[in-house]
Amino acid sequence: MKKLLLPLIISGALFSGYTSANTGEVQFIGAVTSETCDINTEVGGLVKSTIDLGQMTTADKTGDYIDFDLVPRTEECLKKTSGQVGWQSAGFTNTGLANMKGTANGVSIQLTAINSTIPNQDVTYNRQSVDFGNGTDAIGNLKFKARMAATTGQTLTEGTVISSATYAVAYK
């Protein structure tokens, strides 16, 4: 009996973790478009994947805007006359992009499309897709700006501001 019981106890201890399953969420993003394009994120003409928003004080309502472009790498895509940029992040709120991974409280990121069909359109939870172009003139670079902004009704405290969002560009 002891010979049978010992292996059973050992196997139960070793494999007990396999019975409890973890769940999670996977986000998918893509685009169906008339032209496939390589897109770079540029700040001041330099390719960057991180937008440095600088600093603001707890007395400030907003930080300075930092302009950045989504830049197509082919002439065919630079000549497109209409398109859409879709943004995806678990951090989008009604006012912008939450400080998802930073330590500061009461601050979010205001993300604004500059040369969109409706100029200076903010990207929020309720508006994650932005249209560009008039169907006649070339769009060129897709221009955006971002800044830190104090969240209404919350106390702004010192700390870091770190968040992320994914984009997809679809030309029509």
Model-identified regions with their sequence ranges:
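N-terminal signal peptide c-region/cleavage motif recognized by signal peptidases
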Residues: 16-18
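Mature extracellular/passenger domains of Gram-negative fimbrial/pilin and adhesin proteins
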Residues: 20-172
